[in-house]
Design a protein with these regions (language model features):
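Active-site-adjacent "subsite" loops/lids of carbohydrate-active enzymes
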Residues: 390-453
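Active-site groove signature of glycoside hydrolases
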Residues: 343-346, 447-475
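C-terminal segment of N-terminal export signals and the immediately downstream linker at the start
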Residues: 3-5, 24-49
């Protein structure tokens, strides 16, 4: 075998898997406690002496991630043709179960794994603690429930599953892809804490297709927003899968109860995803879009979204307030303004540099011009939506000290900067932006106050939250709870005003009904769009040269055949510096398509 598992160990695995099934059947057939009692010793499953290198390619054959360079103990137990092990992480180290303190016992419809004591240093040292896992057989798979206790805060608990079949992989409802011999890491939400390391999950579910009619779903049944990661390490005959639950960073939990992980087998991709999306719908209380009260009547009639690009990071102005009003007047000749939402991107000055001031900009035309843009636009029926950075603030702005305590720290304590953009094109990513947490009152009060003033002072119809889906597990407070609090308080004060987010993760569908990214992958679209609607991202190439406007992407290719429209999103038209003067014919064609789709 490629993993060089010994014949003796392999026979242990096969024997334990078969024995568990026989014992469960015999116990059920006996029907009484007396009949089952003599089989108590036999009902104990064997502890399999597996390690981190068991049943995986060593060395890796494709893309790989960091891993231990020795055989880290992963003692496991066979159940339902799979093998299960667990690792507990404190804030200082990784801890394996001590095999000498483990006991695995058949239970009605499942197996209980109990461990007294952990090991560290690759098994060379011991540490106090306990772990109890309950494996439950379901109609089509296995549920995994784990509780770990230590004498220090538990950071993370990983459930390890071996025997998962190789095949094409899909996540969060996306298309199935052949990942070959590559290792795969997926993270929920926002990459599970490392944006550019893991593939992103909008909801914690993945599916493996091993044959035309064979699908295995792995999902978390959590009802709170908490970090999940899934790591797939291939071997010759299957995957070793690590199911990682990271506890709330703002809590010190010496006992961590892991929400249920579910493994299920189905025959179609639709069935593979159906149960998970039904779970999150009920767990997070998603309202149906058709009846949800936070959708204003005008949004239900919106046939077109205009992205009006304002001022670039460098200060370059694509369209000032007066130019934007001129654009609206022309658009109103092509489609009734009351059917259009105007998205004001970077209306407040230099894109991101002037975050988080959110004040009308003099170079863009000042107060009078902005007020005219809003009021005159609304007279034509347009709805006006300015953009706000939900979790971004420039540390060099004068008011930084008042909100500095809200900068995000990951669960391990490292400060988070929004440092993944080269704003000035010096071929180096800038680091002057702090990544902010709405769960901290200072930041939430500041941002909520700026949005409230724009609504009160200028009467805007909606507000847009940039990077809305960027939840990170902070050490101070829950970003999700903070966002929900802010949105709900603004809605209570301004019930007619719409909240819109850039992108979503599952739980956000409860309180934000509109987004401009992530309209739903192939197998998720129907579920997601039952609760929310979407329009195209502001970085979508504009007609002509394909400029991304204020966004850092630069240029893309504008598709003259599709006009950058898709069936999953409200038709969207980007206006950059040359769109109105040089690309008006194409802009008119986009508007015509929007009218046709809406039956106007």
């Amino acid at each position: 075998m490629a993993d060089e598992l010994s014949r003796r160990d392999w026979m242990k695995i096969v024997g334990a898997a078969g024995g568990g099934s026989v014992l469960a059947t015999n116990s059920a057939a006996a029907g009484t406690a007396e009949a089952a009692a003599p089989a108590a010793d036999a009902a104990r499953a064997e502890i399999l002496p597996l390690t981190s290198t068991s049943e995986v390619f060593v060395p890796p054959r494709g893309r790989a991630f960091n891993k231990f360079s020795f055989d880290f103990p992963e003692p496991s137990v066979a159940f339902d043709n799979l093998r299960f092990g667990f690792i507990v992480f404190g804030r200082d180290n990784a801890y394996a179960m001590d095999p000498h303190g483990m006991e695995a016992t058949a239970t009605p419809g499942g197996m209980r794994i109990a461990c007294k004591g952990f090991t560290w240093a690759g098994g060379q040292e011991k540490h106090d603690g306990t772990l109890v896992a309950q494996l439950r057989k379901t109609a089509d798979g296995v549920d995994i429930e784990v509780t770990a206790t230590m004498d220090q805060p538990v950071k993370t608990v990983t459930s390890i599953v071996r025997g998962v079949p190789r095949g094409k992989l899909s996540s969060s409802g996306g298309d199935f892809a052949d990942v070959r011999d590559n290792e795969v890491l997926l993270g929920y939400p926002f990459g599970g804490g490392d944006l550019f390391n893991a593939g992103g999950l909008t909801t914690p579910v993945a599916v493996i297709q091993s044959a035309d009619d064979a699908y295995m779903t792995i999902s978390s049944l959590d009802d709170k927003v908490r970090t999940k990661r899934m790591y797939f390490a291939p071997g010759e005959n299957g995957y070793k899968v690590e199911l990682i639950h990271e506890g709330e960073g703002w809590l010190d939990q010496k006992t961590m109860r892991v929400p249920t992980w579910r493994i299920s087998r189905t025959k179609t991709p639709e069935a593979a995803y159906a149960a998970h999306y039904e779970h999150i719908r009920t767990a997070y209380h998603f309202p149906d879009y058709a009846t949800r009260p936070d959708v204003p009547a005008w949004l239900r009639d919106t046939a077109l979204v205009l992205t009006l690009h304002g001022q670039h990071y460098t200060g370059y102005i694509f369209n000032d307030y007066a130019k934007q009003l001129e654009i609206l007047r022309w658009v109103n000749t092509q489609i009734p303004g009351k059917r259009v939402l105007a998205f004001l991107s970077s209306w407040d000055g230099r894109y991101y540099w002037d975050y988080p001031n959110y004040k009308v900009n003099d170079r863009m035309g000042g107060d009078a011009a902005f007020r005219a843009l809003v009021t005159e636009g609304q007279k034509m029926g347009f709805r006006m939506m300015p953009m706000f950075g939900m979790n971004t603030a420039n540390k060099k702005q004068p008011g930084w000290a008042r909100i500095a305590d809200a900068v995000t720290h990951k669960v391990d304590g490292d400060e988070v900067d929004l440092n993944w953009v080269d704003w000035d094109n010096d071929r180096h990513q800038e680091g002057w932006l702090g990544y902010m947490n709405l769960g901290v009152p200072s930041w939430r009060n500041h941002l909520q106050g700026r949005i409230d003033e724009m609504i009160t002072k200028y009467g805007v119809d909606a507000y847009f939250l940039d990077i809305a889906g960027g939840w990170i597990n902070d050490t101070k407070a829950d970003m999700h709870a903070g966002m929900r609090t802010m949105v709900n308080e603004l809605r209570a004060k301004h019930p007619q005003v719409l909240a819109c987010g850039e992108m979503h993760y599952d739980a956000m569908l409860e309180f934000i009904p509109l987004y401009h990214s992530g309209g739903g992958a192939k197998y998720a679209k129907d579920y997601i769009q039952r609760h929310a609607k979407f329009f195209s991202h502001l970085s979508t190439p504009a007609p002509g040269r394909g400029s991304s406007g204020v966004h850092e992407a630069g240029f893309g290719r504008f598709n003259t055949e599709t006009l950058q429209l898709n069936a999953s999103s409200i038709p969207t038209l980007q206006f950059v510096d040359d769109t109105f003067e040089k690309q008006r014919e194409t802009a008119a064609a986009v508007i015509t398509k929007a009218r046709e789709r809406a039956g106007i």
